[in-house]
Swiss-Prot record:
GO terms for molecular function: 3-hydroxyanthranilate 3,4-dioxygenase activity; ferrous iron binding. InterPro entries: 3hydroanth_dOase (IPR010329), 3hydroanth_dOase_met (IPR016700), RmlC-like_jellyroll (IPR014710), RmlC_Cupin_sf (IPR011051). Monomer. Residues 1-160 are annotated as: Domain A (catalytic). Its main location: cytoplasm. It is found in: Cytoplasm, Cytosol. Belongs to the 3-HAO family. It holds the Pfam family 3-HAO. Residues 178-280 are annotated as: Domain B. This is 3-hydroxyanthranilate 3,4-dioxygenase. It is an enzyme of class 1 (oxidoreductase). It comes from Xenopus tropicalis. Residues 161-177 are annotated as: Linker.
């Protein structure tokens, strides 16, 4: 049964999970993972996955450390900013106290592998890494980190010749990442276009992340091939899902399960963000 969730209220009710040692809480955990992350959480490990990740800073700033084309780079995502990280780029989120960030990622395909990697300090030489099929990142990372901290590589700060780094299951992405941008400024700039076209994509059609802002209008008998998360930003709308009629007010969210048939009526002055991730 689909149930609308008010985002602000949900964040306030779950703030205890945004503190160490947990630092995150999943709002939705299906084909689409919708999670909120807090801090402080400073880390040395880098995560690598084949899919994209979408970041939006709800409260406070964060720094996303990445390795872009063989060079370390800090991507500073400020409060209210959005950033789409392409797949296959090593990344290490650095979060601070009293911050809350929204992160989207998707369920992995059966053929996909995730990696956890540590670098030799100050370089891009791989010190230690493990590849695994990701089912629950929150529980799977801890044993790998524990293995690293008890390893010869951690003690010496150098790769262990007895444990050579194996071949990666895929090539790293060589594209240059985008600059984070203010979501509110984007909305203000595109309001006229949203009113005229009824829907405007944030990232175009070449990415697996489909983030679309909808204005007033109606979507009849739509088929959700993957999970779709709706966030009603302004005004109201009404979603008919099976025999259920669900009303969304400002700040409410709703997950439409994959392979569902639904209709969506958006009233005048309605602004809503629809997010889904379709594996490439």
């Amino acid at each position: 049964m689909a149930i609308p969730v008010n985002v602000k209220k949900w964040i306030d009710e779950n703030r205890e999970y945004f503190l160490p040692p947990v630092c995150n809480k999943l709002m939705q955990n299906h084909q689409l993972k919708v999670m909120f992350v807090g801090g402080p959480n400073q880390r040395k490990d880098y995560h690598i996955e084949e899919g994209e990740e979408l970041f939006y800073q709800v409260q406070g700033d964060m720094c996303l450390k990445i390795v872009e084309n063989g060079k370390h780079k800090d991507v500073h995502i400020k409060e209210g900013e959005m950033f789409l990280l392409p797949g296959r780029i090593p990344h290490s989120p650095q979060r601070y106290a009293d911050t809350v960030g929204l992160v989207f990622e998707r369920r992995r395909l059966d053929t996909e592998k995730d990696g956890l990697r540590y670098y030799v300090e100050g370089t891009t030489e791989v010190l230690f890494e493990k590849w695994f099929y990701c089912e629950d990142l929150g529980t799977q990372l801890a044993p790998i980190m524990k293995e690293f901290f008890s390893s010869e590589q951690y003690k010496s700060g150098k790769p262990d010749p007895a444990q050579p780094i194996g071949k990666m299951p895929f090539f790293l992405n060589t594209e240059q990442v985008m600059e984070p941008f203010s979501f509110q400024n984007w909305l203000n700039k595109h309001r006229l276009e949203i009113n005229q076209k009824k829907r405007v994509s944030l990232f175009g059609h070449n990415q697996e992340t489909k983030a679309v802002v909808y204005g007033s209008g109606e979507s009849k008998d739509s088929k959700a091939q993957t999970d779709t998360w709706i966030w009603q930003l302004e005004g109201t709308s009404c979603v008919t899902l099976g025999n259920e009629v669900l009303k969304l007010g400002s700040g409410d969210s709703l997950l439409i399960p994959e392979k569902s048939l639904y209709s969506w009526i958006r009233e005048d002055c309605s602004i809503a963000l629809s997010t889904s991730q379709v594996p490439a």
